[in-house]
Amino acid sequence: MTRSHNHSATLTTPDFDQARAEAAVRELLIAVGEDPDREGLLDTPARVARSYREIFAGLYTDPDEVLTTMFDEQHDEMVLVKDIPMYSTCEHHLVSFHGVAHVGYIPGVDGRVTGLSKLARVVDLYAKRPQVQERLTSQIADALMRKLDPRGAIVVIEAEHLCMAMRGIRKPGAVTTTSAVRGQFKTDKASRAEALDLILRK
């Protein structure tokens, strides 16, 4: 099987190795001084492996495939979906970062739009893999530009990182905000300001 080192790519085929993941979790329990054979931990390796398969499910689906459905609505104004719940995993510590994503675009000259649920699905697929927030934000925006051919795209993610909250600097409640702007949102200050006003308005 071929793997790509391009972070925007996906694996060619699903290849989650349940047995190997279980063995790794068992070894980790031993490494921290636990007894993986005690009652409370007997099924933990299998449970953790199954949860990782779900948490990293985005590795096995190409997000571009989600954006193939288009509708001819002759719409030429911004489409924005706010407050999409988002859960991802910090690739540096393999703990969660979670928050909300705001995703918007201005349809291209053909006025075609995609389904609103597709925007949320793209967020999920890029989030469900080892990530950093900056790359996640850019990947979503780039996917919109690549597949929808819009005049512009904007993505803002606000998230709390448990690697900052529960370890290290230990600052629970700190929120990291990242943005990616493309096309008209990057070149036209008025369009960008309108989008950010809508995103920040509660």
Curated annotation (Swiss-Prot):
Enzyme's top EC category: hydrolase
GO molecular function, one term: zinc ion binding
Gene name for this UniProt entry: folE
PROSITE patterns per record: GTP_CYCLOHYDROL_1_1 (PS00859), GTP_CYCLOHYDROL_1_2 (PS00860)
Keywords: GTP-binding, Hydrolase, Metal-binding, Nucleotide-binding, One-carbon metabolism, Zinc
PANTHER family: GTP CYCLOHYDROLASE 1, GTP CYCLOHYDROLASE I
Quaternary context: Homomer.
UniProt-annotated binding residues for Zn(2+): 90, 93, 163
GO biological process, one term: one-carbon metabolic process
Name of the protein: GTP cyclohydrolase 1
GO cellular component: cytoplasm
Its EC number(s): 3.5.4.16
Pfam families given in the database record: GTP_cyclohydroI
Family according to the record: Belongs to the GTP cyclohydrolase I family.
Catalytic activity, as annotated: GTP + H2O = 7,8-dihydroneopterin 3'-triphosphate + formate + H(+)
Associated pathway: Cofactor biosynthesis; 7,8-dihydroneopterin triphosphate biosynthesis; 7,8-dihydroneopterin triphosphate from GTP: step 1/1
Keyword set includes Hydrolase: yes
